[in-house]
Every structure is written in C-alpha cells, then in structure tokens.
C-alpha cells in the first residue's frame, strides 16, 4: 500500500466557468488556469501521482504545453489512472476536501464523485468529496480563490499494464 497527498489552489475570476470534480457549477466566477482549472481534480491527480512516486501534474501536464490549454481535467485524470495502471497500481480510495466560501457545493458532490470515479474506472464509493468554508478567513474565505486537498491510497495489483 502507498499513500499520496495532493493540494491545489486557483484564483477565482470573472469570465471563466467553475468546474470542480468534472462538474460545471453555476457561479458568477470561475477558476483561472491553463486547463479547465479544476482545482479538485488537480489535487486528486497530485495525490495519485504522489502515491505512485511519479511526480506531480506539472511534470506530466506542464502549463506551458499548448496541448493542455483548456483541456478537461477529467481527461488528465484518466491519463493519471493509466500511469498507475502501467505501474501495476490500483486505487483503494481517495478522500478530498474543497475549501470555498461559495458557492454551496453539497448539491454537486455526488456527481463529482461519479465523474472522477468514471475517469479513473473505479467505483464512486472509492471517492470521497467534502466541502468546507474558512468562515470568511484567508483568500478562500474572502472569495478570492478555491483550494482543494486530497489523499489517495493505492495498492500493487501484481500486474503492470504495458
């Protein structure tokens, strides 16, 4: 068994869609970034890559590479799943937290779990997503950005994909 930890943060700006866990969420602002800026998916990817000892998303999907401009983070998450598979690793579970003052995320959490599980070809029950605020403190509390934390547990399957 191996464990990995991921963290990401993106700035909230006008004129961008808000995508979290592969779900488009109605809101007056969205996250700024090279890809779709899905802060939750990015934290999950870093946790998985960390568990695999395979670096981070910046190494695999650099923000100066035009191939990733505007790309769906669900496509990148699927590629991370492939990296794990090639190393003979399978996801046991993922636990994550989104830190945002708004919007209210509880209506979207189940769909986030389904989307990320689908990208990784695992069961939604293997993906936990929680949301919290910072009670108005810090950049997230002031509505300047959204952060996400994730922990992933993986295990060796005994079969590395080629």
Swiss-Prot record:
<feature type="binding site">
    <location>
        <position position="8"/>
    </location>
    <ligand>
        <name>a divalent metal cation</name>
    </ligand>
</feature>
<dbReference type="InterPro" id="IPR020555">
    <property type="entry name" value="MECDP_synthase_CS"/>
</dbReference>
<feature type="binding site">
    <location>
        <position position="142"/>
    </location>
    <ligand>
        <name>4-CDP-2-C-methyl-D-erythritol 2-phosphate</name>
    </ligand>
</feature>
<keyword id="KW-0456">Lyase</keyword>
<comment type="subunit">
    <text>Homotrimer.</text>
</comment>
<feature type="binding site">
    <location>
        <begin position="132"/>
        <end position="135"/>
    </location>
    <ligand>
        <name>4-CDP-2-C-methyl-D-erythritol 2-phosphate</name>
    </ligand>
</feature>
<feature type="binding site">
    <location>
        <position position="10"/>
    </location>
    <ligand>
        <name>a divalent metal cation</name>
    </ligand>
</feature>
<feature type="binding site">
    <location>
        <begin position="56"/>
        <end position="58"/>
    </location>
    <ligand>
        <name>4-CDP-2-C-methyl-D-erythritol 2-phosphate</name>
    </ligand>
</feature>
<dbReference type="GO" id="GO:0046872">
    <property type="term" value="F:metal ion binding"/>
</dbReference>
<feature type="binding site">
    <location>
        <position position="139"/>
    </location>
    <ligand>
        <name>4-CDP-2-C-methyl-D-erythritol 2-phosphate</name>
    </ligand>
</feature>
<feature type="site" description="Transition state stabilizer">
    <location>
        <position position="133"/>
    </location>
</feature>
<dbReference type="GO" id="GO:0016114">
    <property type="term" value="P:terpenoid biosynthetic process"/>
</dbReference>
<comment type="pathway">
    <text>Isoprenoid biosynthesis; isopentenyl diphosphate biosynthesis via DXP pathway; isopentenyl diphosphate from 1-deoxy-D-xylulose 5-phosphate: step 4/6.</text>
</comment>
<dbReference type="GO" id="GO:0019288">
    <property type="term" value="P:isopentenyl diphosphate biosynthetic process, methylerythritol 4-phosphate pathway"/>
</dbReference>
<keyword id="KW-0479">Metal-binding</keyword>
<feature type="binding site">
    <location>
        <begin position="8"/>
        <end position="10"/>
    </location>
    <ligand>
        <name>4-CDP-2-C-methyl-D-erythritol 2-phosphate</name>
    </ligand>
</feature>
<dbReference type="InterPro" id="IPR003526">
    <property type="entry name" value="MECDP_synthase"/>
</dbReference>
<protein>
    <recommendedName>
        <fullName>2-C-methyl-D-erythritol 2,4-cyclodiphosphate synthase</fullName>
        <ecNumber>4.6.1.12</ecNumber>
    </recommendedName>
</protein>
<dbReference type="Pfam" id="PF02542">
    <property type="entry name" value="YgbB"/>
</dbReference>
<dbReference type="InterPro" id="IPR036571">
    <property type="entry name" value="MECDP_synthase_sf"/>
</dbReference>
<feature type="binding site">
    <location>
        <begin position="61"/>
        <end position="65"/>
    </location>
    <ligand>
        <name>4-CDP-2-C-methyl-D-erythritol 2-phosphate</name>
    </ligand>
</feature>
<dbReference type="GO" id="GO:0008685">
    <property type="term" value="F:2-C-methyl-D-erythritol 2,4-cyclodiphosphate synthase activity"/>
</dbReference>
<keyword id="KW-0414">Isoprene biosynthesis</keyword>
<comment type="function">
    <text>Involved in the biosynthesis of isopentenyl diphosphate (IPP) and dimethylallyl diphosphate (DMAPP), two major building blocks of isoprenoid compounds. Catalyzes the conversion of 4-diphosphocytidyl-2-C-methyl-D-erythritol 2-phosphate (CDP-ME2P) to 2-C-methyl-D-erythritol 2,4-cyclodiphosphate (ME-CPP) with a corresponding release of cytidine 5-monophosphate (CMP).</text>
</comment>
<comment type="similarity">
    <text>Belongs to the IspF family.</text>
</comment>
<feature type="site" description="Transition state stabilizer">
    <location>
        <position position="34"/>
    </location>
</feature>
<feature type="binding site">
    <location>
        <position position="42"/>
    </location>
    <ligand>
        <name>a divalent metal cation</name>
    </ligand>
</feature>
<feature type="binding site">
    <location>
        <begin position="34"/>
        <end position="35"/>
    </location>
    <ligand>
        <name>4-CDP-2-C-methyl-D-erythritol 2-phosphate</name>
    </ligand>
</feature>
